[in-house]
Amino acid sequence: MKLIAESGSTRTEWALVEDNHLVQRVFTEGLNPFFQTRREISRSVRLGLPESFFKKKLDQVYYYGAGCSSYEKKNILGASLVAQFKTPIQVESDLLAAARGLFKCEAGIACILGTGSNSCFYDGKIIVKNVKAAGYILGDEGSGAVLGKLFLADLLKGLAPKELANEFHEKFRISVNDVMESVYNFPFPNRFLGTIAYFLGDYMDNEYVYNLLTNNLRSFFNRNVCQYDYINYPIRFVGS
């Protein structure tokens, strides 16, 4: 039996597979070694998964996750998972999982648009080129976190439409100070920012929201996709 996991910054999907058949699927909170220590990741995995997962006789655990592009970060995740499952672990980036799922053995440009964003050129076997995602502060164009950041920045400066601002305050029931605390002092500000995207999704017919979303996506293409050979290769997307 194998355990396969795919994780973004917000959610992790775990699948127990035996003889190419799905046995059980479970969702837990997202894991990211850029924002969590080894101990925090271990605790999240232990508390999030059913106890039965740790009693299974597993041949291998395959983990594809956000923030796992470097050897150092892969080691953090790998050590956390080995401590819990006591079985061989293979850790790769969520971008490789996306590329394999989107293209299988075909070459193309794979893109992730979720809480964060990422992209790569995949040659049908491996990732050949990757424009750095750079995170929600320095990059992540097109992502939910950046969309939320752009809206909140306008909201705090009085630039968001009044009706939309009122709707936001009525739905979220948070003050300006609460927003600042969530972004600068609380854990996982990227998750908080990403939730704002769901709110904005209900107002797609609003010209301000439409332009905000369009400009965010355009930025993703201009700063990421355009650095690949997008004229000669297909572009495909996954994400929330």
Residue ranges and their predicted role:
Residues 1-61, 80, 102-107, 152-240:
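ATP-binding/phosphotransfer module of carbohydrate and carboxylate kinases, centering on a glycine-rich
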Residues 68-163:
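Phosphate-binding/catalytic loop of phosphoryl-transfer enzymes
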Residues 64-69, 113-116, 232-240:
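Glycine-rich beta-strand-to-loop/alpha-helix junction loops that act as flexible
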